[in-house]
């Protein structure tokens, strides 16, 4: 396979919304049977058990438990691209991309998820609260990494051998252990100088990741090296600090 069918992976967002008006759902998640297994388990949990699982305050647990009771995987669906509404997705701004950009995202962008495994932008999903790092006390798989195993990886690399990693470490770990020698995963890092040290700011990285996905969609990027032209927020590609597996962008 060539680089011309690259895939881009990003993390989901904790903040979610329901939007059934902006875009139509075009596809369904690849592993709904596995997601149903997780949903069935969560519905059996008590308030205290969910609080331990979610590590959240009473109000958040109460709201999410109420949503769980009525949740069904085939109703009140929102395209994943719009369902997640955190910082990264605000800067991606998929709702104002032209149709060609949206088509590009459906072909090239994949969202990793603790609840769904892996998603295309127009897969129909429901709001959920389940981070990939969650310790699944009481579940037959203590870890969601063990639950999903290599399924998201297999789906991701089904028709490509090159992936651009714009996900956090928590989520890219769903893919990286299974990589073969013939496959490439290029990790993008956005660094800024803080007191003489080059570091990645979590918030600024989310903003830049969203903008880079938007850049790729608008430009129809099909080669990893074309991402080196990205220069939003003052970030510039640093050839001196980059390798074949890591593209480093520095804020000047």
UniProtKB/Swiss-Prot annotation:
Which Cys-Cys disulfides exist here? none
GO-annotated cellular components: cytosol
A Pfam match is: H2O2_YaaD
Which biological process terms from the Gene Ontology are attached to this UniProt entry?
response to hydroperoxide
Under InterPro entries, the record lists: YaaA
Protein family membership: Belongs to the UPF0246 family.
Q: Which PANTHER family match?
A: PEROXIDE STRESS RESISTANCE PROTEIN YAAA (PTHR30283:SF4), PEROXIDE STRESS RESPONSE PROTEIN YAAA (PTHR30283)
For this protein, the record's HAMAP family field holds: UPF0246
Q: What is this protein called?
A: UPF0246 protein LJ_0535
